[in-house]
Amino acid sequence: MLVYQDILTGDELLSDSFPYKEIENGMLWEVEGKNPSGEEGGEDEGVDDQAVKVVDIIDTFRLQEQPSFDKKQFVMFMKRYIKQLSPKLDSENQELFKKHIESATKFLMSKLKDFQFFVGESMEGEEGSLVFAYYREGATDPTFLYLAYGLKEIKC
């Protein structure tokens, strides 16, 4: 099994159990989350109304929700993140990262009001990567976006 860790914090954020699709020139990974408790159709007879509904990715990787960002806060976060991450990339990836991160940032900013923000379980929001979750129109399960260059692949 492959696990993907945040390069900056070491937090596990994703595994190969969750297929991803590269978007924005490979800068972002898009992953479909599931709400297993909401997958069973039919009547809710005997189901506790107080039951907590969990999303698989959030639960599996113990992601911690963060307060929303406004545009200014998000730009500040991205500038800091780029500055922290760039030196950790090899020269080839640094070039690709610098070439495409601006368009990926603009893409994320266009959806900013729709996002829920998450960090890894260490809650190093100032130091690590963000995971973005949003619901597509009509969807009951969230879609997650990961900053791909901030992930390190580890074999387990």
Curated annotation (Swiss-Prot):
Q: Which UniProt keywords apply?
A: Cytoplasm, Nucleus
In this chain the TCTP domain maps to: 1-156
Has the keyword Cytoplasm been applied to this entry? yes
- Name this polypeptide is given: Translationally controlled tumor protein 2
Q: Where in the cell is it found?
A: Nucleus; Cytoplasm
GO BP terms, alphabetized: developmental process; regulation of cell population proliferation
Q: Which family does it belong to?
A: Belongs to the TCTP family.
User: Further remark, if any?
Assistant: In a heterologous system, TCTP2 mRNA and protein are capable of moving long distance in both directions with a tendency for movment from source to sink tissue. In heterografts, the long-distance transport of TCTP2 is necessary but not sufficient to induce emergence of adventitious aerial roots in close proximity to the graft.
Q: In which tissues is it expressed?
A: Expressed in stems, cauline leaves, minor veins of rosette leaves, roots, lateral root primordia, vascular tissues of petioles and inflorescences, base of siliques, papillae and ovules. Not detected in root meristems, anthers or seeds. Expressed in stomata, trichomes and root cortex.
Keyword Nucleus in the entry? The reply is yes
Tell me one GO molecular function of this protein.
Answer: calcium ion binding
UniProt xrefs under Pfam families: TCTP
Purpose of the protein: Regulates proliferation. Induces whole plant regeneration when expressed in heterologous systems. Involved in root growth and lateral root development, with a probable role in cell reprogramming. The long-distance transport of TCTP RNA and/or protein in plants may have an important role in regulation of growth and development.
Its predominant location is nucleus
Q: Which InterPro entries match?
A: Mss4-like_sf, Mss4/transl-control_tumour, TCTP, Translation_control_tumour_CS, Translational_control_tumour_p
Q: Disruption effect? A: Seedling lethality at the early rosette stage when homozygous.
Q: Which GO terms describe its cellular component?
A: cytoplasm; nucleus
